[in-house]
Amino acid sequence: MTIELLDSMGVVDTSNAYIRKAVAAPASDVLGRIANLETRLARSAAEIDAAQAVRYRVFVEEMKAQVAPEAGRRKRDIDSWDAICDHLLVLDTSIEGDAEEQIVGTYRLLRQDVAERTGGFYSASEFAIGELLSRHPGKRFMELGRSCVLPEYRTKRTVELLWQGNWAYALKHGIDAMFGCGSFPGVVPEEHALALSFLHHNVRVRDEWAVSARPELYRTMDLMPPEAINPKKALAALPPLIKGYMRLGAMVGDGAVVDQAFRTTDVLIVLPIGKISGRYLNYYGADAGRFSSPVS
């Protein structure tokens, strides 16, 4: 995924009234809990600001992504989509202090109806999303992005809560398909030849779900012939997030894109709701009720 290289005029001010209105939410909107962790949407501009700080710690301090000087000064990963997206959070409620100090993970969610009113999807800067959307005029799409979790919370529980939140949100808004960028570290696709080739030959989107990288950015994923691929080793070489998408039943677009600012090689994940594995629907609950029981 790409970090926008914004100047100070392009940095979103989370204190403005528009964002305050956009993220206003009641205190009863918790989507799931596991022990001391809970997931819900951001309720205030201050919580969005705290989520941007978590993203900065992961994307810039850990992954060495490049950001604009103003974003670096503020130590926030910020772009223009923050003002229009919903921000899914995972909080550790055992941490003393305000909610802003408890945020340990975040996801950014952008519904199609919102994107069409406000300038489009983030992923469209790398992939030909418009072609996919035009093929499904009656379906509702949602983009997932800016997923990150602090290192000490990269556990099964945290990932489960993020997916619980995504699933509950998708059900609430009648979403038919989700998509978003998945990233490999580094800007040399050939270094990930095994994993990229495995995705290309085994889970590439086809027919009505076909979508590809923008022609001017397209990098082939077909780097090894099928007979040369060891599936077990290929699966082990996949980044955890992409592997998680595959387990759910996701497909991958045709072609990768090198993101120089983020220092990653990106692929497009496409997950139609109707293709989600029955195993995971049973696990999370068809009504997203798996982890939604109130605290006793």
Curated annotation (Swiss-Prot):
**What name does the UniProt record give this protein?**
L-ornithine N(alpha)-acyltransferase
Reported consequences of knocking out the gene = Disruption mutant is unable to synthesize ornithine lipids. It can still induce nitrogen-fixing nodules on plants, but it shows delayed nodulation if compared to the wild type.
- Family as reported in the entry's similarity comment: Belongs to the acetyltransferase family. OlsB subfamily.
- List its EC numbers: 2.3.2.30
Q: Name one GO molecular function term.
A: ornithine-acyl [acyl carrier protein] N-acyltransferase activity
Coiled coil stretches, renumbered: none
Pfam families tied to this protein: Acetyltransf_5 (PF13444)
Class of enzymatic activity (EC top level): transferase
Highest taxon of the source?
Bacteria
User: Can you state which reaction this protein catalyses?
Assistant: a (3R)-hydroxyacyl-[ACP] + L-ornithine = a lyso-ornithine lipid + holo-[ACP] + H(+)
Q: What does this protein do?
A: Catalyzes the first step in the biosynthesis of ornithine lipids, which are phosphorus-free membrane lipids. Catalyzes the 3-hydroxyacyl-acyl carrier protein-dependent acylation of ornithine to form lyso-ornithine lipid (LOL).
Gene3D superfamilies, sorted? 3.40.630.30
| Top-level taxonomy | Bacteria, Pseudomonadati, Pseudomonadota, Alphaproteobacteria, Hyphomicrobiales
Q: Which organism is it from?
A: Rhizobium meliloti (strain 1021)
GO BP? lipid metabolic process
Q: Tell me the pathway.
A: Lipid metabolism
What keywords are annotated for this sequence in UniProt? Acyltransferase, Lipid biosynthesis, Lipid metabolism, Transferase
